[in-house]
Design a protein with these regions (language model features):
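N-terminal catalytic cores of NTP/NDP-binding nucleotidyl/phosphoryl-transfer enzymes
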Residues: 2-77, 96-112, 116-117, 133, ...
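Structured secondary-structure scaffolds
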Residues: 2-50, 102-106, 152, 160-381, ...
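A glycine-rich helix N-cap at a beta->alpha junction
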Residues: 77-93
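Cys/His-rich short segments
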Residues: 117-173, 177
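Helix-rich, typically C-terminal accessory recognition domains appended to large enzymatic cores
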Residues: 122, 128, 347-350, 355-392, ...
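Intrinsic disorder at enzyme termini
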Residues: 481-569
Length: 669
């Protein structure tokens, strides 16, 4: 961050409004939101700018296809982008549209200043032109088929000759190259920086920055037959968002931008060369960091609007909610996490709905959700539903927490979102392992109440720290975790620097445990949709709410008449409620779990073939219903002393549990 300004300033690119948002644009915008939330936790005033690019020829083409007036068309899509970002818990400060008067006036000011300084000059252009991309190409860039070299376009090029205004980009090549070499963090990641240097070494040509008017776009001052090239126009939005030219005092507090974030396709030619050269010509400071992230790919090829193969983020969040049973707000947070966790920032990543759902189960349901549920459940069982008084940290554990907080903060500051979350979830894994090592159920059974307090206090402190660490990524889920462990505070208001300090969980009563991230059943996990969004070109107001309908009933064959039993037969079964106090997989089998259950004062071992539905960890702390008087049976060298009751849903075992917690050993009538 520049030391002589007060406000941290981050931007997304402004998005073309030729179709609806998808998870590609969501990745960029969510990342900026995460960084902004982190900056706020550091105590920095912030400005987060996003918006829409509405002056391109593509917009007219899309409006024509939709049978709409261009202005009405862009108004509708701009509103949809805003609704989508609000849905994703994105808290931008300013949403700029390039059809706004403030933007048009600033573009005219830039053009006039550069024309007056001799950096914009009139000339004759002759060469290849792509109407769809509004881009001129060198002869060396064009293949023999004379089609657009942009792989997303590929349309036939036109050979044209027309009078145009040119920005003297070539005049800034040496200065720009030297600036990049002198400021190694200016362009990121490093391999993209090298691409820019190679591009400059090929020779920067003066850029045509006007086009013949089609009746849409920003008119060239005093020349109604020409409009300003959409990229020259669009980049100016960053200055406008910072207050230029009408609010110089505000602009001085905000500019230069700390981070421009965008996809790699608009990095080399526009953000990393044209834009810095424009700023140099205007005599303005350059941004601190210009960062290009990778693409979501499908089968190794870029997914996106033109192919319609990336889902709308609202649809994907609804899908997660439908399959998992999590509420919609939590599912949105889960999507935010999955977007940044599935991609190593800067590189491409293959989009797979199945991979997203599998990570939901592994990270959020099995790890974080399970840690929260088992910690609160065991406190309810062993500590009368209370967070214990603060206890000393296990040897080295407080340093472990502090180091993780520091690592995550450093990663967020370096725009490495996945690394930050890896640091948080290592704590989750360590704490789950800590529970297994300490075995609080055994400590309670042996009457070592102090050991139980120490163990569970460590769990609650870990959950507090993890919630604070994931808050920039999952703000709603973080608040739920904090409330679930008895804390009455807003994680967004807790300074990042204070998070790792041990002993901040006071003795307090706990609410009843409610699963935060319910696990997606195995039989639903692979039931992915091929075309998840039907609203790729419709308004979000038309998008249905997440389904609240129950799952369809399972088809069951009629019972034969000779399968009935008498009430006396049923009375022979002794059904009781048991507490699961320990659970582990049975070696060399994929289906069996070895459960240790408590029936009043008695403990038993039971083997159950439910491992394809449940992990061992998520069963600890649950109550189950067992047949208590079943003749013991030895399996895999272990004597099983009962049977757990479970429903069969399409071959998947779903355990039966009491609606509310009851004393262990209670009879089932």
């Amino acid at each position: 961050m520049s030391l002589d300004k007060k406000t941290a300033f981050i931007t997304t690119p402004i998005y073309y409004v030729n179709s609806s948002p998808h998870i590609g644009s969501a990745l960029t915008t969510v990342t900026c939101d995460i960084i902004t939330r982190y900056w706020k936790r550091l105590g920095k005033p912030t400005l987060f700018l996003t918006g829409t690019d509405e002056n391109a020829t593509k917009v007219i083409e899309a409006a024509t296809r939709a049978g709409e007036d261009p202005k009405r068309f862009v108004d509708g899509l701009a509103a949809e982008f805003q609704r989508t970002w609000r849905l994703l818990h994105i808290e931008y400060d300013d949403f700029i549209r390039t059809t706004e008067p403030r933007h048009i006036a600033a573009v005219h000011e830039v053009f006039n200043r550069l024309r007056s300084s001799g950096d914009v000059v009139k000339g004759l252009y002759e060469g290849w032109y792509c109407v769809a991309d509004e881009t001129f190409f060198r002869d060396s860039d064009v293949a023999e088929d004379h089609c657009c070299p942009n792989p997303e376009c590929g349309k036939p090029l036109r050979r044209i000759q027309e009078e145009s205004w040119f920005f003297r980009l070539s005049a800034y090549a040496d200065r720009l190259k030297q600036y990049i070499l002198d400021h190694p963090n200016f362009l990121q990641p490093e391999f993209r920086r090298n691409e820019v240097l190679a591009f400059i070494d090929q020779g920067l040509r003066d850029m045509s920055i006007t086009r013949s008017s089609t009746g849409w776009g920003i008119q060239v001052p005093d020349e109604p037959d020409k409009v300003i090239y959409v990229w020259f126009d669009a980049l100016v939005n960053y200055l406008v968002g910072a207050g230029w030219p009408d609010h110089p005092e505000r602009f001085a507090e905000i500019w230069p931008a700390d981070i421009h974030l965008m996809g790699k396709e608009i990095f080399v030619r526009f953000h990393a060369t044209l834009w810095p050269a424009m700023l140099m010509a205007l005599g303005m400071e350059l941004p601190d960091i210009i960062y290009a992230h990778g693409w979501w790919t499908i089968g190794g090829e870029k997914g996106g609007k033109s192919k319609g193969n990336l889902p709308h983020p609202g649809d994907l969040a609804a899908r997660i909610a439908e399959l998992s049973g999590a509420d919609y707000e939590i599912s949105v947070d889960a999507l935010r996490y999955l977007l940044i966790r599935e991609m190593q920032f800067g590189l491409d990543a293959e989009y797979s709905e199945t991979a997203f759902l599998q990570r939901f189960n592994s990270d959020l349901a099995n790890d974080l959700g399970n840690l929260l549920n088992r910690s609160v459940s065991m406190a309810g069982r062993y500590l009368n539903g209370m967070v214990p008084p603060p206890q000393p940290a296990p040897d080295g554990y407080d340093h472990l927490l502090n180091n993780a907080v520091t690592e995550a903060g450093d990663a967020l500051g370096a725009i490495q979102m996945n690394t930050a979350m890896e640091a948080a979830f290592r704590l989750v894994s360590r704490c789950n392992k800590y529970i297994d090592e300490r075995q609080p159920w055994r400590q309670a059974r042996e009457g070592d109440d102090q050991a139980v307090r120490e163990t569970l206090y460590t769990c609650f402190e870990t959950l507090r720290v993890v919630a604070m660490m994931v808050q920039p990524v999952m703000p709603v889920a973080a608040q739920r975790i904090i409330s679930s462990i008895g804390l009455d505070l807003n994680p967004a208001e807790v300074p990042w620097q204070s998070v790792g300090k041990w002993g901040q969980c006071p003795e307090k009563p706990l609410p009843s445990p409610i699963p935060l991230f319910p696990r997606i059943p195995a039989n639903l996990l692979n039931r992915t949709t091929e075309n998840i969004q039907e609203s790729q070109t419709t308004n979000m107001s038309d998008m249905p709410e997440p389904s609240t309908q129950p799952l369809p009933a399972v088809s069951v064959a009629p019972f034969p008449s000779n399968s009935t039993i008498t009430i006396e037969d049923f009375a022979k079964l002794e059904l009781r409620v048991a507490d699961v106090i320990d659970c582990k997989p049975v070696p060399n089998t994929s289906k069996l779990l070895h459960l240790r259950v408590k029936l009043g004062e008695e403990e038993r071992d039971i083997l159950s073939g439910i491992a394809e539905t449940y992990t061992a960890d998520e069963l600890i702390g649950k109550q189950v219903i067992i047949i208590a008087n079943l003749q013991p049976r030895k399996m895999r060298g272990i004597e099983s002393q009962g049977m757990i009751l479970a429903a069969d849903m399409n071959g998947q075992a779903i355990i039966l549990v009491p609606e509310t917690r009851v004393p262990s050993g209670s009879p089932v009538r």
